[in-house]
Every structure is written in C-alpha cells, then in structure tokens.
Regions:
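Bacterial N-terminal signal peptides that target proteins for export
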Residues: 1-10
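Acidic (Asp/Glu) and glycine-rich low-complexity loops/linkers
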Residues: 21-51, 56-144, 153-154, 160-162, ...
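Bacterial N-terminal signal peptides
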Residues: 9-17
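Short, small-residue-enriched loops and turns at beta-alpha junctions
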Residues: 150
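Loop/turn-rich, solvent-exposed surfaces of beta-rich toroidal or solenoidal domains
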Residues: 209-213
Length: 271
C-alpha cells in the first residue's frame, strides 16, 4: 500500500456536549512499548474516538457496558517502535479519545489530529499500529486512519469512519453512518437512520449503501467514470446526466450525498 506524505494535518469536527468530561466508572490503561490497552465503562450516547495514521482500525460489538481499545505496534524496515506513542483523553458524558502519535511534535484532540511520521534525522518511521475496539451497545463511534482499512461491525448507534488509503466498511443497526476515503471502496449499511444528513465520498473506488426501505431523502450522486444503481424509486430533479443524479426519495428531507471519480454508486434497500 502506498504511504502518504511524511507530515499531515487532518481537521475534524464532531458535535458534542459542552458538559465537563466525566470519568469512567472503571478504567484501565497499559502500554508496554509494543501493545496498548484501555478498558472502561462507557454509557450509551457517549462517543469513543480512535485516531490512527499507519494501520487498520477494526470495531466489533462488546457485551455489557465495558469498552476495550487495544493496539499493537509493528515495525517494518527498521521502524522505531519507541517513536510511536498512545494518548488517552476522557470526553464529555463518559466517552474516550485514544490516539496513536508518531514523533514528538504530534498532537490529538477532539477537533484535530496532527501526526508527523518522521524518525531520527527526518527519516520515515515505518511503524504500523493495528487498533481493535470492542464497542458497547448504544455508544457512538468515530474511527479514522490515513494508511489502512477501517471496519465497523455490529454498531448500534452513530458511526463516522474515515481513511485516506484504504477501504471503509461500516455497519450499524442504528445510525446515521457516514464514511469517507480517497483510495478505496466505501460500504455502509444501517437499519435505522437516526438524525442528520448522510455523506459518503471516495475518489478511486465504488460506493455501496444499504439503507432502510423507509428512507426519505434529497439525494445527489456524482461520479465521473462509473454508473448509478438504486433500489429506491426516485423523483428526478434537474438535468439528467451520466455523471450526476439528483432527486427525491420518499418525502425528501435529510440530505444524502455520495460522490466518487472512478467508481459506481449503488443504493440498496436493507434486508
């Protein structure tokens, strides 16, 4: 997989309560230099946020109210494991932010992620971090990487999943689910929509969305080299174009936007 430039800044925004962050009922953190683990009680409605730069992020359902976030570091071609560290920060309403940071001049908070993948003397530090998250029912999750696949399975609330070089696959029985990448496919599935608009983007890849049959939305789909396919009856608006499809599903309302350059876009009814 091709790597991104050595330094990057990714602005991110997440609407959250302004309430003072509260400590989890039970927490534990361990970092032995190669493996990292955090576990704690996270209430429904709170957020778990995980940010990575090189490596995958995988989310699976947990049992009970205890969340578990673990990571393993792997060095390639002389990578320095000691130059990659983990940070944790309690969030409002009992949530948690966990970040993997490369280099001394990196930082991470709720609103931004800056990680500089340089080792000694400006040389690239070839270390990958693989995150695994066990997610309690009703907890929202925001996970992201730069070079790596992102997968969310068995979520029951809101999901935001992003990467740059890799595929994104996200499934939630709740919603909404939003997903973006640049070089990779997007697959998103939800049985409920929650509130808010829906956004899906890639450049080199296809987009497939499995959506509730009751969907009502104002839809805009865009591609350059690809096509459109939908299971939903749509009232078209504007000029019909092989590169752009806009219209209304059901009664309209929320916005559903999906765009790619090289790939197709498919809307399917959830089974």
């Amino acid at each position: 997989m091709n790597r991104s430039p050595l330094a990057l800044v990714i602005p991110v925004a997440l609407a959250m309560s302004a309430a003072t962050a509260t400590a989890q009922a039970t927490t534990g953190t361990a970092d032995n230099g190669t493996r990292f683990n955090w576990n704690g009680t996270v209430p429904a409605g709170a957020w778990i946020i995980v940010r990575n730069m090189n490596g995958s992020v995988s989310v699976k359902p947990s049992t009970g109210r205890t969340a578990d976030i673990s990571a393993i570091k792997r060095a390639e071609r002389g990578g320095d494991l000691s130059m990659v560290r983990f940070t944790t920060k309690p969030l409002a309403n009992g949530g948690m932010l966990v970040c993997a940071l490369w280099g001394d001049n990196s930082n991470c908070d709720e609103d931004s992620y800056h990680s500089n993948n340089n080792g000694n003397h400006g040389r690239r530090n070839n270390v990958e971090v693989e995150f695994t998250v066990s997610l309690p029912s009703g907890v929202n999750v925001k996970v992201g990487s730069v070079n790596g696949d992102v997968e969310v399975a068995g979520a029951t609330a809101e999901v935001s999943a992003t990467t740059v070089n890799g595929d994104v696959r996200a499934v939630s029985s709740g919603g909404p689910v939003n997903a973006t990448t640049v070089n990779g496919d997007v697959r998103a599935s939800m049985r409920a929509l929650g509130s808010g608009d829906l956004r899906y983007t890639t450049v080199n890849g296809s987009i497939q969305l499995d959506l509730p049959a009751s969907l009502s939305a104002d839809v805009e789909l865009r591609t350059v080299n690809g096509g459109f396919e939908t299971d939903f009856p749509m009232t078209l608006t504007g000029r019909v174009s092989p590169r752009r499809l806009s219209g209304k599903i059901g009664n309209g309302g929320r916005e559903l936007r999906a765009s790619t350059v090289n790939g197709s876009i498919t809307l399917r009814k959830s089974s």
